[in-house]
């Protein structure tokens, strides 16, 4: 099998999250997945639009709700790594044996450890552990809770947990209001977006940062690094700019990184390579490293995205956040097909490399299922070929065409592959 490589010339994605889905009919029915667009993904799980997953297609469990979501992943693969570890805390190598609280007591027919049945408490406790282990503790992540009872369960476990979360890890709540409508400043009734509807999944938050970069970096620029004071030549290095609009600080990427890390070492010991956040040498405001390098990645690798974003019409007042996910969905068929091919590349990448799933056809296929224990492997295997890209469509065993049509397709790469895979 040829080793496949993922392209490294893409900018940091505007949004990617790992979510915990819960049935509103039966709260013990849980599902873990990942997506770049939570609103679209939830609609798929609830059968409102094409897509979703076999497990969430059961009518007696719909509608589903997103109880919480972890966001801020720097790449799609990073989200998949975290998702797989969250789905499989009993075998993931990211959790050291001394910290593991989920253990496999049974084996599948293939001989691999069978995932223990999860509860809300086990998923939240393992989420807490993953956010404290070295693999993920310094990632620029955020946790958002949309269900009050789930947040209370999280707080209860956090008090009893031995490991502590990073102080700068944002934990945000956005619960449904007492009334779905609130009065605006003019006294008129208006809908206030909340929960996943309020998530900004486009690059709108980065737009002003990009506009600032467009003004600074040009062929006749005469600037110097704010840290080392060396002259900065156009297109001859990786230069970072502060996201604060009124700040004029420009630095080498390595200079800013070392500046942040030196400040961190004064507060804690360790030999970290990538900072989390730090104080801008210009405006002296705290800024997040991920915000800085996201603009840099777009400037260096996402020219088409930048041109479209800066050249797009302004969104009408009051609809910025609420429509960000609609903007993503209305980009056109051509871009949607391109995105689907990228998602399929992610699946192929893990199939061929990270998971070494050579015998995946004989294995229990990967849909994250915390529902009934008596689900057969055959039902899981139906969902194996769920790519929407016609170029990569494959035939599945002896199943009839009618049965295949009845299966809800997957998207957003929320599959887990359980072959010979003890991941990264």
Curated annotation (Swiss-Prot):
Skewed-composition ranges (Basic residues): 105-117
Residue intervals of the GIY-YIG domain: 14-96
> Which biological process, per GO, is one annotated for this protein?
double-strand break repair via homologous recombination
Output the InterPro entries linked to this UniProt entry: GIY-YIG_endonuc, GIY-YIG_endonuc_sf, Slx1, SLX1_C, SLX1_endonuclease, Znf_RING/FYVE/PHD
Its top-level enzyme class, in one word, is hydrolase
Where does it sit, as one GO cellular component term?
Answer: Slx1-Slx4 complex
Q: Where are the zinc fingers (SLX1-type)?
A: 225-283
Alphabetic keyword roster: DNA damage, DNA recombination, DNA repair, Endonuclease, Hydrolase, Metal-binding, Nuclease, Nucleus, Zinc, Zinc-finger
Region annotated Disordered sits at: 97-117, 321-340, 368-395
Q: What Gene Ontology molecular function terms does this protein carry?
A: 5'-flap endonuclease activity; crossover junction DNA endonuclease activity; zinc ion binding
Q: Which residues form the signal peptide?
A: none
- Where does this protein reside within or beyond the cell? Nucleus
Q: Which domain of life does the protein's organism represent?
A: Eukaryota
Q: What's the cofactor? A: a divalent metal cation
Q: Which CDD domains does the UniProt entry name for this protein?
A: GIY-YIG_SLX1
Query: Might you give the EC number(s) for this enzyme?
Result: 3.1.-.-
- What task does this protein carry out? Catalytic subunit of the slx1-slx4 structure-specific endonuclease that resolves DNA secondary structures generated during DNA repair and recombination. Has endonuclease activity towards branched DNA substrates, introducing single-strand cuts in duplex DNA close to junctions with ss-DNA.
**Family assignment?**
Belongs to the SLX1 family.
Q: What is this protein called?
A: Structure-specific endonuclease subunit slx1
């Amino acid at each position: 099998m040829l080793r496949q490589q993922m392209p490294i010339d893409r900018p940091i994605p505007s949004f990617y999250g790992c979510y915990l889905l819960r049935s509103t009919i039966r709260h013990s029915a849980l599902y873990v997945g990942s997506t770049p667009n939570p609103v679209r993904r939830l609609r798929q799980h609830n059968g409102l639009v094409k897509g979703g997953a076999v497990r969430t297609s059961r009518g007696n469990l719909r509608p589903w709700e997103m109880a919480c979501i972890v966001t801020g992943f720097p790449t799609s693969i990073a989200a998949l790594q975290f998702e797989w570890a969250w789905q499989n805390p009993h075998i993931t190598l990211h959790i050291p044996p001394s910290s593991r609280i989920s253990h496999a007591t049974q084996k599948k027919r293939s001989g691999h450890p069978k995932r223990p049945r999860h509860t809300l408490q086990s998923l939240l406790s393992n989420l807490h552990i993953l956010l404290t282990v070295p693999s993920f503790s310094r990632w620029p992540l955020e946790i958002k809770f949309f269900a009050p009872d789930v947040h209370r369960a999280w707080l209860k476990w956090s008090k009893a947990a031995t490991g502590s979360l990073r102080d700068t890890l944002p934990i945000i709540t956005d619960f449904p209001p007492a009334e779905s409508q609130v009065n605006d400043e003019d006294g008129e009734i208006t809908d206030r977006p909340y929960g996943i509807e309020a998530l900004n999944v486009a690059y709108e938050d980065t737009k002003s940062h990009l506009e600032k970069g467009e003004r600074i970096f040009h062929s006749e620029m005469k600037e110097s690094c704010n840290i080392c004071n060396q002259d900065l030549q156009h297109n001859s290095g990786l230069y970072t700019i502060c996201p604060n609009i009124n700040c004029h600080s420009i630095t080498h990427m390595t200079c800013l990184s070392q500046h942040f890390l030196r400040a961190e070492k004064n507060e804690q010991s360790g030999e970290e390579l990538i900072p989390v956040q730090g104080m801008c040498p210009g405006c002296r405001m705290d800024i997040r490293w991920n915000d800085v390098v996201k603009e840099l990645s777009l400037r260096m690798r996402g020219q088409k995205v930048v041109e479209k974003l800066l050249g797009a019409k302004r969104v009408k007042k009051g609809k910025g956040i609420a429509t960000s996910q609609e903007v993503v969905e209305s980009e056109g068929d051509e871009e949607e097909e391109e995105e689907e091919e990228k998602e399929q590349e992610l699946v192929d990448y893990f199939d061929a490399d990270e998971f070494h799933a050579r015998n995946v056809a004989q294995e229990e296929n990967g849909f994250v299922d915390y529902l009934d224990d008596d689900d057969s492997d055959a039902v899981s295997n139906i969902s194996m070929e769920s790519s929407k890209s016609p170029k990569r469509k494959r035939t599945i065993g002896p199943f009839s065409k009618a049965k295949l049509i009845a299966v809800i397709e997957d998207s957003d790469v929320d599959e887990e592959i359980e072959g010979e895979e003890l991941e990264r």
